[in-house]
Amino acid sequence: STTSLADLFFFMNNQFSMFFPMVLFILIGSLFYQEYKNKTYINWITYGFSKKKLFLSKVTVSVVIGICFAAVLFIAFGLLVAILNGAGRLTGGIALFLKLAIGFGIEAGVVVFVTTCLGAIVINLSRNIIVTSVVGVIYGFVSCLFIGSERGFVIPGSFAYRVSMFFSDKSTYYEVPISATIGGCISIVFCFIVLFL
């Protein structure tokens, strides 16, 4: 039997939107936790190095790893699409795949940046990898809970998911698209302002 590219992307993207934020929380938590566990953070600030530089360097490393990981996931998805397409078991062309790539890129960018910054704040406030991991799991579930809500655009991960799915099926976007788009963009900007203060 054949399946559509849009359905396959829907399945993959649902898994991505739930589990990827959890992975990012654990990643950024681990990067900072190593500093606290090895007491290298104390050395860093005792020698007069900027705490802000340390924070931004860890966030940058996590963002780069997160973007690379998301790219690898989409490349693996592309290989699966190529295999299924070659076997004649997939409907949907290259034009749809390219649109999905744009949508996924937008979603991954928003999720990586917002989640990494949020995770960095949680680990620096708690200094506990378990607390950070639990908050990451909660954030992943909360993002997924708001995906279907018409007010879900206030959660950046939920908004990014709906934007991504718009490239697959326009009917999955918000009923009031202009207000939701403006609100979602404002929520992302607001998150960045709060996270970088």
Question: Which ranges hold each PLM region?
Answer:
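Transmembrane alpha-helical segments in integral membrane proteins
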Residues: 20-36, 41, 113-131, 187-197
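Short N-terminal micro-motifs specific to bacterial/archaeal maturation
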Residues: 16, 32, 45-46, 151, ...
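Helix-loop-helix units of permease transmembrane domains in multi-pass membrane transporters
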Residues: 31-64
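Short glycine/serine/threonine-biased micro-segments
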Residues: 46, 117, 134
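Terminal transmembrane helical anchor/hairpin motif
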Residues: 1-11, 133-197
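Membrane-interfacial segments
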Residues: 33-36, 40, 80-92, 126, ...
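Secretory targeting signals
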Residues: 1-26, 56-125, 166-183
